[in-house]
Amino acid sequence: MPVLGSQRRLLGSLNCTPPATFPLMLAPNRTGPQCLEVSIPNGLFLSLGLVSLVENVLVVAAIAKNSNLHSPMYYFICCLAVSDLLVSVSNVLETAVMLLLEAGALAARAAVVQQLDNVIDVLICGSMVSSLCFLGAIAVDRYISIFYALRYHSVVTLPRAWRIIAAIWVASILTSLLFITYYNHTVVLLCLVGFFIAMLALMAVLYVHMLARACQHARGIARLQKRQRPIHRGFGLKGAATLTILLGVFFLCWGPFFLHLSLIVLCPQHPTCGCIFKNFNLFLALIICNAIVDPLIYAFRSQELRKTLQEVLQCSW
């Protein structure tokens, strides 16, 4: 990526320098104190990408195989898996080409590598935007299923779900093209940061409201069964833990990347911000980790999907 990820650009591999020996080191900063820089080896990028690739392919295969999973909720989960799949594919492809260029096993002109780099950047940006959108869509779908349970199937219909999915993909592609074209414009970066904050706020409000409703429902059941404290306390702790994991993973994996974008606008020349910029590869690795964790949170918790996944694995063997 031109501004965001110069450390990961393919063009840099045409005239590369030897990688650092130690994964964690203090990087000198001539205008300020020393910086703590975490170096992510290309092999680790490749390994994380492959794990995410396999995991999300299994989710897509399981949902496609089982007709019982052909519902709006699982279609949103499937599209989230496809988005995470594209994040993994783009990073695996970029890392593989970089390793081949560094080893001298692939001879390519700078113009060809530039075009490939642009294609990969569009894939990465588009898949990131679509991934955030489908996380928000899943949150809205669950909210409607809880607060409007009787009207859910009339509100969230398959045609509407398909239109939402198509709109998200089109918007993601257009956004990625605009981002790559106008990456050096402050407005573009601010729009991306604002989009992340909006998704974070949307998910936090919806899931907190859902947790409050679930706890209220549990209290009502507890009063009927005259066992208010044990049920309410256990359910509340479990719900709070689930909410903390869901929002915590989202914030920890995506937050540093969008902090990086914010600092490019706010303090591009400040020494402290420069220290954060040096860890861009770590922020990309966290996004790939999110692509690994998403199936565990949204897909594999479904008993029906796990059962189908076992059938898919047995057929593959």
Swiss-Prot record:
- The segments annotated as topological domain Cytoplasmic are 64-72, 141-163, 212-240, 301-317
Q: What is this protein called?
A: Melanocyte-stimulating hormone receptor
- InterPro entries named among the record's database cross-references: GPCR_Rhodpsn, GPCR_Rhodpsn_7TM, Melcrt_ACTH_rcpt, MSH_rcpt
Q: Which residues cross the membrane?
A: 38-63, 73-93, 119-140, 164-183, 192-211, 241-266, 280-300
Keywords, A to Z, come to: Cell membrane, G-protein coupled receptor, Glycoprotein, Lipoprotein, Membrane, Palmitate, Receptor, Transducer, Transmembrane, Transmembrane helix
Q: What is the organism field in this record? A: Rangifer tarandus
Q: Which Pfam families match?
A: 7tm_1
> Subunit composition?
Interacts with MGRN1, but does not undergo MGRN1-mediated ubiquitination; this interaction competes with GNAS-binding and thus inhibits agonist-induced cAMP production. Interacts with OPN3; the interaction results in a decrease in MC1R-mediated cAMP signaling and ultimately a decrease in melanin production in melanocytes.
Q: Which family does it belong to?
A: Belongs to the G-protein coupled receptor 1 family.
Q: What does this protein do?
A: Receptor for MSH (alpha, beta and gamma) and ACTH. The activity of this receptor is mediated by G proteins which activate adenylate cyclase. Mediates melanogenesis, the production of eumelanin (black/brown) and phaeomelanin (red/yellow), via regulation of cAMP signaling in melanocytes.
Q: Which domain of life is it from?
A: Eukaryota
Gene symbol of the encoding locus: MC1R
Glycosylated residue positions: 29
Lipid attachment locations (S-palmitoyl cysteine): 315
Q: Which GO terms describe its molecular function?
A: melanocyte-stimulating hormone receptor activity
Q: Name one GO cellular component term.
A: plasma membrane
- Major site of localization recorded for this protein: membrane
Show which residues sit on the Extracellular side of the membrane. Answer: 1-37, 94-118, 184-191, 267-279
Instruction: Specify the protein's topology with respect to the membrane.
Output: Multi-pass membrane protein
Localization per record: Cell membrane
